[in-house]
């Protein structure tokens, strides 16, 4: 193989690795975001049980 061919193969491998890595990272971020939202909802549930916190954050607590 010549130098050009080796350089082309190197660029192809780097590009492929970057694209695959980017797609996997994007998928994992959605999972992280969903988990983060669940934690946030759990924290609001605790806040909604506390009357002073509920009074200050009524937009996050369902009416009861």
UniProtKB/Swiss-Prot annotation:
Classification via InterPro entries: Conotoxin_a-typ (IPR009958)
Subcellular location, record wording: Secreted
Principal location listed in the UniProt entry: secreted
Region Lacks the Ser-Xaa-Pro motif that is crucial for potent interaction with nAChR: start-end pairs: 49-51
Record remark: domains: The cysteine framework is I (CC-C-C). Alpha4/7 pattern.
Tissue-by-tissue expression: Expressed by the venom duct.
Any GO CC annotation of this UniProt entry: host cell postsynaptic membrane
Designated name of the protein: Alpha-conotoxin-like Lt1.3
Function according to Swiss-Prot or TrEMBL: Alpha-conotoxins act on postsynaptic membranes, they bind to the nicotinic acetylcholine receptors (nAChR) and thus inhibit them. Has possibly a distinct nAChR binding mode from other alpha-conotoxins, due to a different three residue motif (lacks the Ser-Xaa-Pro motif).
Annotated S-S bridges: 47-53, 48-61
Signal peptide positions (record): 1-21
GO molecular function: acetylcholine receptor inhibitor activity; ion channel regulator activity; toxin activity
Family label: Belongs to the conotoxin A superfamily.
Positions of the propeptide segment: 22-45
Keywords carried by this UniProt record: Acetylcholine receptor inhibiting toxin, Disulfide bond, Ion channel impairing toxin, Neurotoxin, Postsynaptic neurotoxin, Secreted, Signal, Toxin
């Amino acid at each position: 193989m010549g130098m050009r061919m080796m350089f082309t193969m190197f660029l192809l491998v780097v590009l492929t690795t970057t694209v695959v890595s980017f797609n996997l990272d994007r998928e994992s971020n959605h999972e992280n975001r969903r988990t983060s939202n669940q934690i946030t909802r759990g924290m609001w549930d605790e806040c909604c049980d506390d009357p002073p916190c509920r009074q200050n954050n009524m937009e996050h607590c369902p009416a009861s």
